[in-house]
């Protein structure tokens, strides 16, 4: 079971990684004149998203629901977050690769192709949804019902079996 002190530490780490993601999304365009710094920020951002994915799955694995073999129940409850996180991760990597390819050799030019603008908008939209759903999932996983046998779990199990 995830103890309160450990949960607070894990939640703080998740929020720190989300804050870094928000920071890079907000201010990375200001550093387009320094492509090496922008590249490092993008790499760290992608690693932070990957760490958040790992942390959320470790939290899933730590639940009584998962240990009882009800993986389908967890997936059903949190599939939106799982899918959105994967989509956001793919969009972020795509945007970072595209931006670095266009601006690496000539960082003085302000290059925005139609495709890049479209990808930029979708990545930023996905970022907002990712932050909301990820925070909601992280907080919901603090519910004690996920860490012990309960009437709620038995009722959910019966609904899944139908």
Curated annotation (Swiss-Prot):
This is Transmembrane protein 138. It comes from the Eukaryota. GO terms for cellular component: cilium; vacuolar membrane. Its main location: membrane. One of its GO terms (biological process) is cilium assembly. InterPro entries: TM_138. Belongs to the TMEM138 family. Required for ciliogenesis. It is a multi-pass membrane protein. The keyword Transmembrane applies. Keywords: Cell projection, Cilium, Cilium biogenesis/degradation, Glycoprotein, Membrane, Transmembrane, Transmembrane helix, Vacuole. It is found in: Vacuole membrane; Cell projection, Cilium. Glycans are attached at residue 6. The chain crosses the membrane at residues 7-27, 41-61, 80-100, 115-134.
């Amino acid at each position: 079971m995830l103890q309160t002190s450990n949960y607070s530490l894990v939640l703080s780490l998740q929020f720190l990684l989300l804050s870094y993601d928000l920071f890079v999304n907000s201010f990375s365009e200001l550093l387009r004149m320094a492509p090496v710094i922008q590249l490092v920020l993008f790499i760290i951002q992608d690693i932070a998203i990957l760490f958040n994915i790992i942390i959320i799955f470790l939290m899933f694995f730590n639940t009584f629901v998962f240990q009882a073999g009800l993986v389908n129940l967890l997936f059903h409850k949190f599939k939106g977050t799982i899918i959105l996180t994967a989509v956001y991760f793919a969009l972020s990597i795509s945007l970072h690769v595209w931006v670095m390819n266009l601006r690496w050799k000539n960082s003085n030019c302000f290059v925005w192709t139609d495709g890049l603008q479209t990808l930029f908008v979708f990545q930023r939209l996905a970022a907002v949804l990712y932050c909301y759903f990820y925070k909601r999932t992280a907080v919901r996983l603090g519910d004690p019902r996920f860490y012990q046998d309960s009437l709620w779990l038995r009722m959910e199990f019966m609904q899944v079996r139908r």
